Swiss-Prot record:
NCBIfam families assigned to the protein according to its UniProt record, in alphabetical order: PRK07564.1-1
Active site: S112
Organism: Rhizobium radiobacter
One Pfam entry name: PGM_PMM_II
Protein name per its UniProtKB record: Phosphoglucomutase
GO MF entries: magnesium ion binding; phosphoglucomutase activity
PANTHER family, sorted: PHOSPHOGLUCOMUTASE (PTHR22573:SF2), PHOSPHOHEXOMUTASE FAMILY MEMBER (PTHR22573)
GO biological process, one term: glucose metabolic process
Length: 542
């Protein structure tokens, strides 16, 4: 039976770059999750009798909200819900299920790489029928509705058994609990040369993947160990846990340091990779070589034809604005379209739907293609294994040869986390005021060529997104980018991106922070980061 429950609105349900993210105690407030889910449904139209996909990354509070979402979908008039067994669906797998079964859309429960647990992070994101995150016009409508909502509808049916694959009824709604891995693994087998990768592994090439007690564990075990023949135990931390084992499921050099150290040790594996909370990010490490996400995007694009699913070539490349320009040099050489977008995977969706790009990437360890409409951690890992198998070269050799051909973009990101929001906003406001005066100014050997606050003009729907990050570009291809992140839940995160282009192969072996030292110093001179943040050093350097 459908019940209508009176409620009062919350004023803080504004979705960020990847949905609404808050601490669990916030989501556990009376009607908080229900209000937001109802606001999603109220902002949509035309879903009567249609299919909705629901799944999450297994974090704390995932199961409870899934039950609420199913009952509210029944009350809203959806015809069918597809939900992952155990409430599990990685974000790229959810995107694939939406596309494969022509669903109306999907509710993805995740806070991505943020920690999980009773006092940690939770998130709700709506994905549209193409499998990608809802564009701003929809998230703006959801937010507007959430501020005035006065009731929600929900079925009073019993909870369904999420652990049992099969078909269930909730009032008039059919709920299919599906194997969360099967469709995704089948898609990967279509895109990549599993035979070549299997032979590589059988020949003694040792692969280790750290799933960080998050959602990709079951996917990586099925694909790497069962289908590609990697020894049992090659996938570490393979069981998804509500608190990710007490760890921060963010695949970078801080939170995946154990994996990095293992691959770099003399007797360690040849190849290591890690993925994040919901499976959309990746870190790739070869013996003696950490691959930056910006380089990874460029190298995958340059070698795209080596994978069967991309043998006909790619139509174009897109990258987020803070991502290094390494991919631009590949696009230029191969005669491909190159698009620079704001941070947030949703901006790539239009470009992929319009056939303008095939491969996309972000510096924040996100890479993907038009096979789904989300970034995809395991996809990137398998692409690298396919390239290694096809070229019969080590990761280190592949990267250094790429630099020799295209030049090296020295690149680093400095994160200042949990900065006082007012201080961070003041820093950005003061810097914005300065921008017009910077071009022509010299700082040592660095001369400012241009400075702006990045605005994106979408070539597909003509929409404009302003204030997407401050760029200071120097003559010769170096640049500094500053932006506030929209994915954390405590304070503000100020991100500084520093990049220097080096065409001379004889100068490709410099330690990254040393190669960028003058730019890092100039960034502080121009922006006054230390003065505004009270942090003399970044929290994380990538």
């Amino acid at each position: 039976m459908i019940k209508t429950i009176k409620t009062t609105p919350y004023q803080d349900q504004k979705p960020g770059t990847s949905g609404l993210r808050k601490k669990v105690p916030v989501f556990a407030q009376e009607n908080y999750a229900e209000n937001f889910i109802q606001s999603i449904f109220d902002a949509l139209e035309g879903f009567e009798g249609q299919t909705l996909v629901i799944g999450g990354d297994g974090r704390y509070y995932n199961r409870e909200v899934i039950q609420k979402a199913i009952k509210m979908a029944a009350a809203a008039g959806f015809g069918k819900v597809l939900v992952g067994q155990g409430g599990i669906l990685s974000t790229p797998a959810a995107s694939n299920v939406i596309r494969k079964y022509k669903a109306f859309g999907g509710i993805v429960l995740s806070a991505s790489h943020n920690p999980g647990g009773p006092t940690e992070d939770f998130g709700i994101k709506y994905n549209i029928g193409n499998g990608g995150p809802a564009p701003e016009k929809i998230t703006d409508a959801i937010y507007a509705r959430s501020k005035v909502i006065d009731s929600y509808k929900i079925s009073d049916a019993a909870d369904i058994d999420l652990d049992k694959i099969g078909s269930f009824k909730v009032d008039e709604l059919t709920v299919d609990v599906i194997d969360p891995v099967a469709d995704y693994a089948a898609l990967m087998e279509e895109l990549f040369d599993f035979g070549a990768i299997r032979s590589l592994i059988a020949g003694g090439f040792k692969v280790v993947v750290d799933s960080m007690s998050a959602v990709t564990g079951p996917y990586a075990v099925e694909i790497l160990e069962k289908r590609l023949g990697a020894p049992k135990g090659s996938v570490r931390n393979a069981t998804p846990l509500p608190d990710f084992g007490g760890h921060h499921p963010d695949p970078n050099l801080v939170h995946a340091k154990e994996l990095y150290d293992d691959v770099m040790s003399p007797e360690g594996p040849d190849f290591g990779a890690a993925s994040d909370g919901d499976g959309d990010r990746n870190m790739v490490v070869g013996k003696g070589m950490f691959v930056t996400p910006s380089d990874s995007l460029a190298i995958i694009a340059a070698n795209a034809k080596l994978a069967p699913g991309y043998a006909a070539g790619i139509s174009g490349i897109a990258r987020s604005m803070p991502t290094s320009a390494a991919a631009d040099r590949v696009a230029e050489k191969l005669g491909l379209g190159m698009y620079e977008t704001p941070t947030g995977w949703k901006f790539f969706g239009n470009l992929m739907d319009a056939g303008k790009v095939t491969i996309c990437g972000e510096e924040s360890f996100g890479t993907g293609s038009n096979h789904v409409r989300e970034k995809d951690g395991l996809w990137a890992v398998l692409y690298w294994l396919n390239i290694v198998a096809a070229r019969k070269e080590s990761v280190k050799d592949i990267v250094t040869k790429h630099w020799a051909e295209y030049g090296r973009n020295y690149y680093s990101r400095h994160d200042y986390e949990e900065v006082d929001s007012d201080a961070a906003n003041t820093l950005v406001a003061i810097l914005r005021e300065k921008l017009a005066t910077l071009p022509g100014t010299s700082y040592g050997n660095l001369k400012v060529a241009a400075a702006d606050d990045f605005a994106y003009h979408d070539p597909v729907d003509q929409s404009v997104s302003k204030n997407q990050g401050i760029r200071i570009l120097f003559e010769g291809g170096s640049r500094i980018v500053l932006r506030l992140s929209g994915t954390g839940t405590a304070g503000a995160t100020l991100r500084l991106y520093v990049e220097r282009y080096e065409p001379d192969a004889a100068r490709h072996g410099i330690e990254t922070q040393s190669a960028l030292a003058d730019l890092i110093s100039v960034a502080d001179t121009i922006a006054g980061i230390k003065a505004h943040t009270a942090d003399s050093e970044p929290t994380v350097i990538t």
